[in-house]
Amino acid sequence: NSYADETFTNLESVPKKSEVRFIGRCLGTFLLAEKDNNLFILDQHAAHERLLFDKIMNSQGASQPLLIPYKIHTESKSQDNQLEKLKTKLTQIGFETIKKEDGYWEITSIPERWTGTEYDLRTLIFVKQVEPEQIIRSIAAMTACKAAVKDGYYLDDETSAKLVEQAFTLEDPHCPHGRPIYTVFSREQLFELVKRT
């Protein structure tokens, strides 16, 4: 179970005062939990993606050096300026960016969880977005999405419970693309579904 071990090594247990109780897994994609007389159905990919995204955006992700740096040739002064504006933020999320000379840049390290290509990064950097912050957010979202546990991947009980606990600590219960991490059914809604009073 090395993928789960590697992917979830940094998941920390939430203090026991948490009222969340992990119930089980469903359809290889969902985690079931109970809290405050409500049933929560969590999307394991969306929850893990959000946790990774927040870590990346808070500069907690590890970086790894590239044996062969990404080489980026800017095609205009505006692209060069764009990269200059993004340089500090890129470094904060794990992309070590060095300007070799006007029009020539190198990325010498990437976030540990980055699975994109040089082309992916270049496309994200030079996409026609006004705010540099949105570009950084897009890069972090792509990194988190590709690194998050996939649908159909079986998580053991301990890992599932940790993921559920941490999902309930998130300030924003949505993946970086806006999908909700969970759906909630109250006790009353469940009773109504089975025609019980």
Segments predicted by a language model, with ranges:
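Acidic, low-complexity intrinsically disordered tails
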Residues: 1-19
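Long, charged low-complexity intrinsically disordered regions
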Residues: 18-197
